[in-house]
Every structure is written in C-alpha cells, then in structure tokens.
Amino acid sequence: MQMKATILIVLVALFMIQQSEAGWLRKAAKSVGKFYYKHKYYIKAAWQIGKHALGDMTDEEFQDFMKEVEQAREEELQSRQ
C-alpha cells in the first residue's frame, strides 16, 4: 500500500513538471485539482496509510481501516455512475 502511495505521488509530480515545462502552470494546477477531485478517496486512503505506517497499529485497527478504504472505494465507484 505504501508503494502505491509513493507511485501516485511520483506520477502527480511528473505530470506537474511536464505541464509547467510547457509554460502552462495554471493549466497544470487545474489538472492536478481535477485529478485530486477524481481520485480523492484513493489519495485520502494513501494519506491514512502513510500516517498509520509511522505508528503502531493492532490487527483490529488495521482491519477497521481496510473496511474504511473499501467503503470509500465503493462510494467513489457509485459517484462515477
């Protein structure tokens, strides 16, 4: 999970660099905003994973967290329909 969050951050950074090199900084910011809005549940889940990776988590807490991630994923899929 932490690897996915890292990959996501790198992809967003590369996208921003590509857009700003073309001189479209405003367009890049708008695109990142759209990207965030479209994938906000995954970004929030990645943020939570990062926070929990630094602290101690019991198995029960981890299971509750994974249920929240799955629920957020289902909500996102429903919002796309």
UniProtKB/Swiss-Prot annotation:
Cite a single Pfam family from the UniProt record: Styelin
In its record, the post-translational modification comment is:
Contains L-DOPA (3',4'-dihydroxyphenylalanine).
From which residue to which does the signal peptide run? 1-22
Residues where 3',4'-dihydroxyphenylalanine occurs?
Answer: 36-37, 41-42
Residues with the modification 4,5-dihydroxylysine, per the entry, are: 27, 30, 34, 38
Record's superkingdom? Eukaryota
* Subcellular location(s) per record: Secreted
Gene Ontology process terms (BP): defense response to bacterium
Keyword Secreted attached? yes
Enumerate the propeptide ranges: 56-81
GO cellular component terms attached to this protein's record = extracellular region
Protein name, entry field: Styelin-D
State the species of origin. Styela clava (Sea squirt)
Organism classification, top ranks? Eukaryota, Metazoa, Chordata, Tunicata, Ascidiacea
